[in-house]
């Protein structure tokens, strides 16, 4: 009976991780769009506009967004790994439970 509760718990955790993964992928996509926007802004702003500070700010923002994209990619990989581990554990528990059930019937 404990294995049933563990299977349910692991399945719920796996589903939660999938939702987190989907959310994280959305964040990666959104931040990539922001990086592209900032690259385009850098193309339009010229030094003769006497806005050197603006260029510096935009470059810093671009770097920050790129760092966020990298962080989200790493987080996605970690979440995916945990989901795979949970899937394996659920499979093992299910097989073990089947063997135990079949052993009792025999």
Swiss-Prot record:
Principal subcellular localisation of the protein: cytoplasm
One Pfam family this sequence matches: DUF496
Record localization: Cytoplasm
InterPro entries: DUF496 (IPR007458)
Coiled-coil spans in chain: 7-34
Keywords recorded for this protein, A-Z: Coiled coil, Cytoplasm
Cellular compartments per GO CC: cytosol
Entry similarity comment: Belongs to the pole-localizer TmaR family.
Role summary: Pole-localizer protein involved in the regulation of several cellular processes.
Protein name as catalogued: Pole-localizer protein TmaR
Biological source species: Vibrio cholerae serotype O1 (strain ATCC 39315 / El Tor Inaba N16961)
Gene symbol of the encoding locus: tmaR
């Amino acid at each position: 009976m404990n294995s049933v509760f563990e299977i349910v718990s692991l399945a719920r955790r796996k589903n939660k991780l999938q939702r987190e993964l989907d959310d994280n992928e959305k964040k990666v996509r959104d931040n990539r769009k922001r990086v592209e926007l900032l690259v385009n802004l850098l193309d339009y702003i010229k030094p003769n506009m006497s806005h050197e500070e603006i260029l510096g700010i935009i470059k810093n923002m671009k770097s920050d967004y790129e760092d966020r994209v990298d962080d989200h990619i790493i987080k996605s990989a970690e979440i995916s790994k945990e989901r795979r581990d949970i899937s394996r554990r659920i499979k093992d528990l299910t097989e073990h439970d089947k063997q135990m059930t079949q052993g009792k019937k025999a």
